[in-house]
Amino acid sequence: MKKAFTGILASLLLVTTLAGCGTEQAAPQNTASGDTGTKNEAKKGGKLTLYSPNAAEVNNPIIKEFQDRTGIEVQLISGGTGDLLKRVQAEAVSPQGDVFWAGGADSLEAYKKFFEPYKTKENDNLLPEYVDKNGVWTPFAALPMVIMYNKELVKAGEEPKSWNDLLDPKWKGKIAYADPAKSGSSYTQLVTMLTAFGKDDKGWDFVKNFVKNLDGKVLSGSGLVYKGVADKEFAIGITLEEAALRYVEGGAKVGIVYPSEGTSAVPDGAAIIKGAPNMEQAKQFIDFLVGKDVQSLIQKEFKRRSVRKDAEPIQGIVQTKDIKLVNYDFDFAASKKDDNIKHFSKIITGAE
């Protein structure tokens, strides 16, 4: 079953998801015959609408396999985390989506009143440090935040080693960073930096100096960060570990740094939209995401850290226990998200 799952990746990665806020598409269908690992699994059918900020290369193989195994037709709507969460909020009276998949769990928590609590059948197999005690969201993968740099633009030995190094004047205008109002991962990065220097005036003083070094360049989406660094548009960028590792694995001349002050490894998650039109199919999809097959796939193919207890360590990368982490305040990140975004926006616009 696993062999069949991973074997379809090469062809699937040729399928491009139409990216952008509110872009809608029918997920790819499989018309090939043969064993897709569904012989012992009943096909219940039905439909499912997903809202997802994930990259196409992550979405496509997982959605396709879910369709093959269940017979459920998936409609994918892609966009940035912030825009899609606002869409869920706007549709609250008459929900159009079923599952919100990915985006930092702290961002999902901030919108928890729009999600339906669900305890996955795989709950006992998940690492407890990543599980939401209230069951509003289900963890998908643990995502350390890193500094990514281009080896052709950054001389050996001059790589930033810390968050504080990002304030060096030599990096002014050369840092790729996404707008935390639009990107869930960027918001997590903002809170990580605040935590490293103090969630009070000291932390915000650091953020003000960091923004000065951005020199007015704030990107509209997280995907533009790692792409911008790899394409030599920026010397360095703040991004997800798994995104940077995909470029490293692909042979790009980039490197990654785990900041010396500590970073975060907040999971991204999936949540069922309250009042979802296809509730049973939504539950099936949540269970599927944290099942052993999908969790093995994301480790092997995407270098994402599994949230399962029985997951094997990913070879060739720093082990989780060896990454210095800040004491990330999840409740602060979720409950103060609107305030933190407004504060950051004032700094960006020069109002503060």
Question: What are these model-derived regions, one by one?
Answer:
Residues 1-47, 309-310, 350-352:
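Short, low-complexity disordered leader/linker segments with a strong preference
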Residues 34, 39, 43-44, 49-75, ...:
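Short, polar/charged alpha-helical segment
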Residues 49-59, 82, 89, 95-233:
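Extracytoplasmic ligand-binding site segments that recognize negatively charged/polar headgroups
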Residues 106-111, 230, 235-253, 302:
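A ligand-binding cleft/hinge motif common to bilobed small-molecule-binding domains
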Residues 146-153, 191-194, 266-278, 297-298:
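A bilobed periplasmic-binding-protein/Venus flytrap-type ligand-binding module shared by bacterial periplasmic
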Residues 207-211, 218-219, 250-274, 309-310:
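Periplasmic-binding protein-like
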Residues 264, 273-328:
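Mature extracytoplasmic/periplasmic domains
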Residues 316-352:
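Extracellular/periplasmic bilobal clamshell ligand-binding domains
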